[in-house]
Amino acid sequence: MTKSENEGGFISHLTELRKRLIHSFILLFIFFIGCYFFSEHLYGFLVEPFANAVNDSGTDRRLIFTALQETFLTYLKVSFFAAFFVTCPYILMQIWKFIAPGLYKHEKIAIVPYLVLTPILFFLGGALVYYLIMPLAIKFFLSFESTGASTGLPIQLEAKVSEYLSLVMKLIFAFGISFQLPVVLSLLARVGMVDAKFLREKRKYVVVMIFAAAALLTPPDPITQIGLAIPLLILYELSIFSVNIIEKKNKKNA
């Protein structure tokens, strides 16, 4: 193959990549506009764990904003997050269509399960945050409120619109990304970088690393830190099981 043919092939790949990125961006923008019309309802969905927790306390609550543009910008962020979440499968499909022609058949068969598993695990991480971690964390933080009997003045939460969204999205992304642990370890096992024996031997170090990562990725309270660490430990054990299966298949095919 001549130099000009190599350059032509490279340019054609760049052109195809550009086309797929543009298509993904256009779809993301369309959904972003659509989601903005429902941004108040989307934000209401995210606020529901907070609303349920504070309603259980029997006191009147509200969310405040201290900057004129704060609520507007918060709704823009909510719209973008929702649009990205909806279009993520399409974006992954575009990436797959770009790289698939350069893969062998057995490589395609090996990668497809991970493309399916990745968004599922992310969704499970986000669902864990929404339905379990957030309600427990909110109740934990609200327990530090005071009526003023021992503090002189009442201590009561006045949560900001933007800060609440930042907390929720930080937790969702932290859990969603952390839940990719089985995918990462299985891929490393397929390329021969780790094996089940190695993962078992390093288990005690991994436990320490998981709790350290949970402390860095979550707010400084034991509820969310333990809530992230325990599922990760379970996923690590499932990863060892998955790597065992991969090793048996590799030996069988060898």
Short names for language-model regions:
Residues 1-254:
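Membrane topogenic/interface segments and analogous intrinsically disordered interaction regions
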